[in-house]
Amino acid sequence: MTAKHHLELTQVGIDFPTPKGPFTALTDVNLRINKGEFISLIGHSGCGKSTVLNIIAGLHKATKGGVILDGQEVNEPGPERAVVFQNHSLLPWLTAYKNVELAVKQTSKGRSKAEMRDWIEHNLELVHMSHAVDKLPAEISGGMKQRVGIARALAMEPKVLLMDEPFGALDALTRAHLQDSIMEIHADLGNTVVMITHDVDEAVLLSDRIVMMTNGPSATIGEVLNIELPRPRDRLALADNPQYNHYRHDVLTFLYEKQRKVESVAAHRKKSQDGAKGVQENVA
């Protein structure tokens, strides 16, 4: 595979062993991502969104095809790809500062202690957590924990920030504040982001492109929607924006109409095949 883009997924497929034989979770996933793009993956539960993210992260290895980042094939986890999960995954016995420091020590071995301290404080400031550097996870809210998790990921200076439903467990107001923070950080850093979400409004608000997945098994990319809304984006202004609502409608149409038709056709085809098989068996 030759690299033409920042991040490339080419003919990616993955099978998982089961007692009844291989289960094909993904098939023929092709995606080209440019440096600095914000990509959202959306689809129904079980469509393979997290599997795609895990393959990019190097946590799963594709059965077919592969992933290339800046000319290098991805086969295992690496610091150039930082992951933020729905669960913040902070170490409970370490302060916010120490949790970020742990990641920085693994990726910034050339920095002096003073430089390392400045870098940790800078990333905590990016997510508006400077006031809580000495707090343990148990002493801060769920939204604050997730902010620290994002700071920890950013402090690794990854080429790609991978986020698996990072705001899914938060209340609506906290989620909105974090979405605004992510937009600010993305504007400041210009980093590449791949995010999984179930939230249509979140996808349209944050993304440059929305990748819509078909339902599994053998899930793949159904459609890719370009979001041509100017940045910076204001959620209140967008609420009455016809183009915003058009994009929102397109995603909902794919998820709740087109997928239903696809499933209906597939079910009808399977029923016809089963019926034909039964006739053949009776004739035999």
Per-region residue spans from a language model:
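Conserved ABC ATPase signature
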Residues: 136-140, 144
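Conserved ABC ATPase "signature" region
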Residues: 112-132, 184
